[in-house]
UniProtKB/Swiss-Prot annotation:
SUPFAM superfamilies: MurD-like peptide ligases, catalytic domain, MurD-like peptide ligases, peptide-binding domain, MurE/MurF N-terminal domain. Pathway: Cell wall biogenesis; peptidoglycan biosynthesis. The keyword Ligase applies. GO terms for molecular function: ATP binding; magnesium ion binding; UDP-N-acetylmuramoyl-L-alanyl-D-glutamate-L-lysine ligase activity. Catalyzes the addition of L-lysine to the nucleotide precursor UDP-N-acetylmuramoyl-L-alanyl-D-glutamate (UMAG) in the biosynthesis of bacterial cell-wall peptidoglycan. It comes from Streptococcus pyogenes serotype M5 (strain Manfredo). Its main location: cytoplasm. One of its GO terms (cellular component) is cytoplasm. This is UDP-N-acetylmuramoyl-L-alanyl-D-glutamate--L-lysine ligase. It is an enzyme of class 6 (ligase). A motif (L-lysine recognition motif) lies at residues 404-407. It catalyses: UDP-N-acetyl-alpha-D-muramoyl-L-alanyl-D-glutamate + L-lysine + ATP = UDP-N-acetyl-alpha-D-muramoyl-L-alanyl-gamma-D-glutamyl-L-lysine + ADP + phosphate + H(+). Carboxylation is probably crucial for Mg(2+) binding and, consequently, for the gamma-phosphate positioning of ATP.
Amino acid sequence: MITIEQLLDILKKDHNFREVLDADGYHYHYQGLSFERLSYDSRQVDGKTLFFAKGATFKADYLKEAITNGLQLYISEVDYELGIPVVLVTDIKKAMSLIAMAFYGNPQEKLKLLAFTGTKGKTTAAYFAYHMLKESYKPAMFSTMNTTLDGKTFFKSQLTTPESLDLFAMMAECVTNGMTHLIMEVSSQAYLVDRVYGLTFDVGVFLNISPDHIGPIEHPTFEDYFYHKRLLMENSRAVVINSGMDHFSFLADQVADQEHMFYGPLSDNQITTSQAFSFEAKGQLAGHYDIQLIGHFNQENAMAAGLACLRLGASLADIQKGIAKTRVPGRMEVLTMTNHAKVFVDYAHNGDSLEKLLSVVEEHQTGKLMLILGAPGNKGESRRADFGRVIHQHPNLTVILTADDPNFEDPEDISQEIASHIARPVEIISDREQAIQKAMSLCQGAKDAVIIAGKGADAYQIVKGQQVAYAGDLAIAKHYL
């Protein structure tokens, strides 16, 4: 429960309070109301709900519906003049985060918080950290793919970083379930829309940066994207940063006055020898590590997670065991066909991650290589040119372009746009299952491979704003082995 007096105090301390307006006019103080629930969904309110009117598409009709269900007061940046009191604020999203934090009893103070950001690798690093901490503690995890609030039951995540009301409700459930740590992926979008406003992490990890999520509904420029990624560093007590990433010197200067650990080529924490399924490290994580995920970048993700978990209480033995146990659904999953050709299923969904995926596969498969790829509709439009550029740099690759969450766009048009950046013929098969079947039928022996990129473990396609059932890349590939 939270009282009107408490929530006004929170807003005033954050300099986010304008006034309360009701039939009697303007009020700086207000009394007599308390709330047992928080909501931003007008269909889920009653007389004891504190409602947040948020979003560019919010309509007064939503409030009218809520009022018929008993709503007594709402918080908004706009007075909709509907006859009930309104708490007017300068920034509704910041208000949501701080009020949710207090409403749920400040659960962030009862958990050790670890956050990962980066253009790629967040989910893999989060899974590494989860398995490391699970050796001696009780970690919960909010990842792009799956969420667990009790370390036992996993469910599909809706957002990389949940909306603030959901985030703190889920954190509170983690505390109730006896969890000791929480591992999160924190997207640049989470900072852009203030989902984690006011939250301080015990350790923040910056894995890498490359152009992505740049478009009309995301970040207008790379500078804006990079800036919002860096906000995790400002909001973490200690940081772990990849010294091999672009713009590392800038980040090193930024974190010079806070506790920090670096890993990678310009640091003391390095991988000294690397095999397909093992590596040796020096520095704070010195030792031998077995790993199920192939690729040097996955070994670096393991190093990043290991350094973070070391600070959060994990032992070197915990870290070694955790790395050895980690598998990630939809990340570098490998199948073998009856003719011994390989099928790689991976979530690679931007130019940089695609380049790394192709490079890893080319190290191990020297025959005919076929790539199945698409790009999502109505977001991340810059990826399409990036995909074309990467494919152009791999001239021996046979490419079939297909659908990948086309949303409100025509998948054929998206494929044609990608193809326009490739200086050689490619095939377009918009039906993703048919594209996979065609590519697999072209494999002849153990040196050949099919690379299915983009969707990973997703068992749906986003079409016209809806999740449409899709068997999933891995299930389809297994069917045609």
